[in-house]
Amino acid sequence: MLDSFYNKNFFNRDTIGYLCDTIEQEQFQIEENKNQAEDKKKTRTLLVHRNKIKHIIKDLESFIVWVNDRHFGYDLYPFNDHDICLYNIYDPHGEYGYHVDTSRSDVWDMKLTVLVNLSTEKFTGGQFMIYNGVEYEVPELSEPGSVLIIKSFLNHKVQPILSGQRKTLTLFGCGPKIK
């Protein structure tokens, strides 16, 4: 059974630039680090309203549905204009410790975590790691434009950035709680 699925160079350099510019010009709300994430998450995160970028990410959403249908098989809700995406900016020393992605809702949960490397400059460090009985790196996410889809319940982290700036967009494939 697959833990992850990736597509290298899903977005080209021009689309990455356009997506970053669109997000950064909108001046979205900055996520407050609360609860246990406060000690783990050392990054700036903008809460991006999907409806502001849907014209740019529509092919990505179609790809997510295709990957889920063929490789994961979760019951997912359709993407919605009210969904929130996360735009993470990691500067030097920025990192995000081991965590899982989940909801506090009684009726829905996160099934898939989708990460897109939107870095517009070179960076060192920032390796994406998964722990599933053993720790391993997912080097495919290091390439700008690459997309990584993982099961949301997997422990994952971003190693500290040593130099440069790492940018990612995170979407979540959500669906009903398992009953």
Predicted regions and their residues:
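Catalytic core of non-heme Fe(II) oxygenases with the double-stranded beta-helix
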Residues: V65-K179
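Non-heme Fe(II)/2-oxoglutarate
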Residues: M1-F79
